[in-house]
């Protein structure tokens, strides 16, 4: 689950009413499609042409609070350049003093997730067609140094002709390697073993694993790794053993096993998949066009000029990046994007101009078991640019670094905040966990392992989602020692372990102070408990122990 910022009022100077609806630029905003970290996604309609778009609204205050201004400014320009038939396009960015509106491609077919839930598994031919489209989009972004890291059927949309469109490319670029699990609010069913175990990973290989899970879902209508008990689910993923129905083609089984290799070094690459016999069958040429742009020594003058105009830089800067083969530099990425866009538009012209849909989904099979529950949300993209969003930071202050985002696992409630925290304290006491009250809505909890005598630690924090709903967020704090040493927190000596009455009393005092309801119920934690901490490495899996604590607590609270 995610921490949701309050929906703030936007400046009236840039926003107008149109027949009772909000108008941004030439777009009239309609219903809300989803809610994400920085704001909402709404459907929009161009007042002149009538074309529908999806408008993602990024809240400026939320962006500043997460210290990602620089990342968003540098990435938006390149995401605007992304032009691939199977990736959701970003058309325009409109700014107001309080919000940023990203005008994106709207598709009417809904999520692939919903389609599978409604219709069940697809036949092999249709599964291959959609998987080829998805992998083409993944390959396109990997070649331009962007990794998705949260691929799943919820992030694959379907257009009116039942073609796949990948959404939310670019989100992961605002996060450091190895940190994405703590920021992801999606289901862990699609996560690679190295992600859920907290090991470092380069990036592309986790997209391969997730693509393999999607392929399995297309073919079988279920997931290869699934369990209601999260620790058991994690064990299944890390073991990499999954059931293969008898109706599956042996050729596709071999591909699935190669893509779902636990060892990332043995896992299939995109090149391996493209060379697989099952994948190559009926493969449209436009999905993987020849790519001479990287090996060519010739410079495209038109592309060079366009990069200079968009980034307000000199030709020498761009040429320096190209000649030094610094492909990760935003200037080089933009140059190659422009080259690729031109080539793909030429080679896929028939695709863009097609007026008749491909063969419809004709499979009559249905889901044999329900899909894992998910939280409905849309994640805000974070593309690269140099000048598009300078107004985000008029003082152009330098940030000290990206604040570490948190992964949210929790439960929702419509009870009063003090009642929620009182029940939490009772549950903790019943489980014989130890806890400390950091503030009325933030607890730090630990459990002693009777076998190893080591402690598993977690934090519980309450947030307000909307006017009636609250989110109790669970977070592992096994990294507290590292944070303290790195200076991200100021350790102070802990007092005695807090009891239930202190939690309830503090909560009542906080309510009496009249805290504003539109923000989270507590401020950021700035100190850590330094009472006897375990500096020595602990055996076993911290992640599994954390989820066991979560499961035990949720079980008590649900009684």
UniProtKB/Swiss-Prot annotation:
Belongs to the protein kinase superfamily. CAMK Ser/Thr protein kinase family. SNF1 subfamily. Residues 302-381 are annotated as: AIS. This is 5'-AMP-activated protein kinase catalytic subunit alpha-1. SUPFAM superfamilies: KA1-like, Protein kinase-like (PK-like). One of its GO terms (cellular component) is nucleus. Changing residue 269 to D: Retains activation ability. Changing residue 269 to A: Hinders activation. It comes from Rattus norvegicus. The modification Phosphoserine is found at residues 356, 360, 397, 467, 486, 496, 508, 524, 527. ATP binds at residues 33-41, 56. GO terms for molecular function: [hydroxymethylglutaryl-CoA reductase (NADPH)] kinase activity; AMP-activated protein kinase activity; ATP binding; chromatin binding; eukaryotic elongation factor-2 kinase activator activity; histone H2BS36 kinase activity; metal ion binding; protein kinase activity. The gene is Prkaa1.
